[in-house]
């Protein structure tokens, strides 16, 4: 927020709804995953995996929409106005994943430890589904 107003970005509040929704959703999915683990039904493992994929995709899409909105809906009254070669207002959207040069800055966006743990947990759940399916056939 300190520098964003110079290029016309909106103020980013600390109380966006996602900061309340995401922790609850993650907590529910953890509890649901533990319950499914104790039940040991391989079909439920797959259902949990698919639900996590859907929720993860929805979360990334929501984050992309926030980035797009804040990076493209700029105030025309900003102290600094930057234009693209075609005369349109230059956007300042950071990357969802990867690196991107924005003027003389390079913005980076890569997963951290929590994302790696989430990925490992999802892969273990998928592996448990295949093991459970194989055991049921035998």
Positions of the model-derived regions?
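Membrane-helix exit/interface motif
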Residues: 7-13, 32-39
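Mature, soluble, non-transmembrane domains
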Residues: 37-76, 98-100
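Hydrophobic alpha-helical transmembrane segments
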Residues: 17-37, 46-57, 116-122
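Long, glycine/tryptophan/cysteine-rich extracytoplasmic
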Residues: 1-18, 64-109
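A hydrophobic membrane-anchoring alpha-helix module
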Residues: 108-135
């Amino acid at each position: 927020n300190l520098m964003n107003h110079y290029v016309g970005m909106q103020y980013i509040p600390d109380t966006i709804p996602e900061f309340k929704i995401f922790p609850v959703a993650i907590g529910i999915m953890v509890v649901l995953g533990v319950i499914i683990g104790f039940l040991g039904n391989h079909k439920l493992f797959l259902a949990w995996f698919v639900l996590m994929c859907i929720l993860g995709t929805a979360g990334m899409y929501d984050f992309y929409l926030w980035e797009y909105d804040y990076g493209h809906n700029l105030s025309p009254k900003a102290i600094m106005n930057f234009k693209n070669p075609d005369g349109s207002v230059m956007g300042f959207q950071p990357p969802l994943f990867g690196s991107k040069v924005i003027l003389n800055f390079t913005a980076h966006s890569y997963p951290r430890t929590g994302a790696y743990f989430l990925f490992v947990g999802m892969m273990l759940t998928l592996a448990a589904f295949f093991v459970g399916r194989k055991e049921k056939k035998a």
